[in-house]
Structure formats: structure tokens, C-alpha cells
Amino acid sequence: MQRMYLIPLKDRFMALIPVTILTGFLGSGKTTLLKRLLSEAHGQKIAVIENEFGEENIDNDILVTESKEQIVQMSNGCICCTIREDLRETLQLLAAKKRKNLLEFDRIVIETTGVADPGPVAQTFFMDEEIAETYLIDSIITLVDAKHAPQQLNDRQEARRQVGFADQIFLSKTDLVSKDETEALIHRLKHMNPRAPIKAVHFGEVPLKEVLDLRGFNLNAKLDIDPDFLKEEGDGHDHHDHDHEHGEHCSHPSHQHERGHGHHHHHDDDVKSFVYRSDRPFDPAKLEDFLGAIVNIYGPRMLRYKGVLNMKGTERKVIFQGVHQLMGSDLGPQWAEGETRTSKMVFIGIDLPKDIFLQGLEQSLV
């Protein structure tokens, strides 16, 4: 099991450059959104890292320059940069130029190719100490083409992984499908990833505040902003009878089911999520052993997992999260007086053996 490089929370937002990872299949609207970032007078200094193997360059005329490094200053103060070899090298180059005052930028947006799995891109920011001390992942944003998504999700595991990794999902082209089709798609996406809010967008017109500073990779911030972030909608029933949570915008008819009854889906996606909850504290040593074991065995299939834990021996919440084999934890705020100390964990992955996970977590309690 590999450990994430974790910078102490108090230092984290002061010095680090936030990074947004943008994913989505061909035609989902990534390029439209990036063009807006690079052309609008939004007052932010953003460095956009565009993948050279992307389907469509931001603007071929602008990017054809003599510069070997393919770094171009845009008229609105943003920077566009094309990955030549390796994302890590590109990030180091940008950081070095910023330190020498050769480039000015406040944040980075990385475009992945349509067929990319965002996992390895995200892992770059935890595996390399120099990168982890310079940058902080803010969020992974996935654009989903409402017209073609049902087929893409059926056919391509990369599309399902992009949904599983997302902190925010934007649905494009909803004007090309019926209301029922849109609702069915939202229901399907929520089944795969209950954490990510879903919002319909038109021609990449997304308010910047919904793209930047989401802090999807920092649970502490999210809990401070939204104390209900890890609460299930309107019910306190126990974890064994529920496979996934539903978003507020989901009015699919099959949600009018009796509590505790399973759902029947016409599709069987391999990316699924489940939630574990307990009011008993965890034994730190037992939990570490169990998580280490499952990450070693199932890590490649564990897309995102995170939670707030009640640990024996501390009066503070323990914030835990991981991407594939990389796992990290942090001390969060104090448990409030009179607050029920409930641990809650969300796992999103590919065909994960839910029963093994739940049983192992139960056995890790005090």
C-alpha cells in the first residue's frame, strides 16, 4: 500500500496551487468549457494544461508556436500549455517558471483525453513529493454528453470510471433528449457515484464558481461548508439495507420504493458505490490492517473512497480518503458536544465485494 503525501491542513491552502482535472468523452463539451476559461475576462490567472493527444486543440492557430515547451500566454492573462511527454514534467516546468516569475498563474486546469482514466492523473499529485508540496487537487469534473452517454456507459469502462471519479458532473446536450431520458441518465449516474452533484449545462456555459474551488479532495473544508455532506437523504437507517444514495434532483419512479428493498435496473454497470456507517468507534490498528489488506487486493478497482471516522483514542474526527492504492488520513475538527459520533465511509469502485468490505469494517470496530 502506498501512502499519500499529505501536507498539514493549516498549511495546505496557503501555499499550494489548486488543480482541477477535467474529464469527459469526445463531444461532451470539454473544449467549449476550456475555450471559455482561456478567453473570458474572468479575472483569474489559470494555466490550462491541454493533452497533446486530445481530440481537438483549444485553438490550433494559437498553439502553433516556435516554443518547444508549447506554453502560450493568452490575452486574458491565462496560459495554455500542451503536454509533450509527461504530466509530471509539465507540472514541474510550470512551477519552476512561476518561482522565477517567468509565468504568472494562480491555478491549473488539466484536460484529459476523452478515453483517459482520471485515476493515474490524480495519483500524480500524491505519489511525487515535489508535486505534492506544490499542488493540491481541488476536484475532478466530468462532462457527460446526455445524447450519447447511455451507449458510452454501456460500451466503455473509461466512461464509467470518469463518472466514478467525479466530484462534480455536468450534463451537456440535454436539449437533444427527452426529460424522461435525462432523468433515467441522472438516476444511473447517481447509482454509480452518489457523491457528485449533477447539473445540466448548455454549450459549456458553466459558472466558474461551479468549476473552481470545489475542494472535492478536502473533506475537512467540505464538512465545514456543508455539515450534511456525508448524511444520507432524510433517513438514519442502517448501512446493510442500502446500496446507493440519491441526489436531490433524482425523481426516478423506482425511488418510490419501500425502504430496504433493492433496486432493479435495466443496466448493470460495473462501477458502483456503497456506504458504511457505524456509531461504534474503530480500533485504529485493526482498521489500518484491514484497509491495508483490501487496498493491496482491490486497489486497482477502488476508484475513490473517503469518509469521516470515529476513532478510539482521539476526540477529533478522522478524515480519510484514497484513490486506487493511495490512501491518506488527517485529523479533522473536534466532535461537537452531544454530537452522535457516527463513522461514515463511501466506496466507489469496479465490482467491489461489498460483503467483504462491510464484514471487515465491522470486525475493525472496538
Where are these regions (language model features)?
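Short, hinge-like loop/turn segments at secondary-structure boundaries
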Residues: V64-S67, A159, R215-L219
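Short, Lys/Arg-enriched N-terminal segments with co-localized hydrophobic residues
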Residues: M1-F13
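C-terminal accessory "lid"/substrate-recognition subdomains
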Residues: D11-F13, Q168, V177-A336, T340, ...
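Flexible active-site lid/hinge loop adjacent to a nucleotide/diphosphate
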Residues: P150-F165, I169
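Nucleotide-state-sensitive switch-loop elements of NTP-binding domains
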Residues: A15-Q152
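Conserved beta-strand/loop subsegment of P-loop NTPase cores
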Residues: A47-I49, E104-V109, Y135-V144, V163-T174, ...
